[in-house]
Amino acid sequence: MSDATNALVTGPPRSGKTTALKRTVSRLLEDGYAVGGLSSPECREAGRRVGFDIVDVASGERAVMARVDGVSEADGASNGRDEPCESGASAPTIGKYTVDASVVDRLAGRALPSAVDDADCVVIDEIAPMQLESDRFVREATRALELSTPVLAAITLDATDGFLGAVKNRSDTERFVIEPDARDALPETLAEWVRSRIRPR
């Protein structure tokens, strides 16, 4: 067994990174392990992807992270406690999406420290340009990667520079590339990887 404490799941866009992590989390929860962290599910309207939300894996709190037509307070969070959003030209854009970095700040500032302190496994879906618009996300993700709690993170396949490249080049990471002929077996492989690294609390 390697000494790596961070598993990076990577592959091309729409290769199944999020699905693999969701199925892995389900297996760990069924085993009675505590899992925390962040996920970034896509949002679709009339079959069209219109943006991404950000979700606290442990609490279920959900907020709007990015939208094609910009983000606004009206989008809000599912619990009605969303902070005022940036919007319009002042908000960062990634491709066609406008990103609300303040929402990522808020959820990353709660979900990731809580997961590091209290969970058996930290999930980060994903480490990608939208999330990196939040300095708080970068700080908390870095802290999670540096500590001993196992981390499962999705990361873009072609990332080689900056923070993304630095994460991929960490000596304490093990990379899992999604292959079409092994996709169905990957969640159990990842779950076993985590189980072997969970330390008694």
Cite the ranges covered by each PLM segment.
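Phosphate-binding P-loop
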Residues: 1-4
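Hydrophobic anchor at the beta1->P-loop junction of P-loop NTPases
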Residues: 9
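P-loop (Walker A) phosphate-binding loop of NTP-binding proteins
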Residues: 12
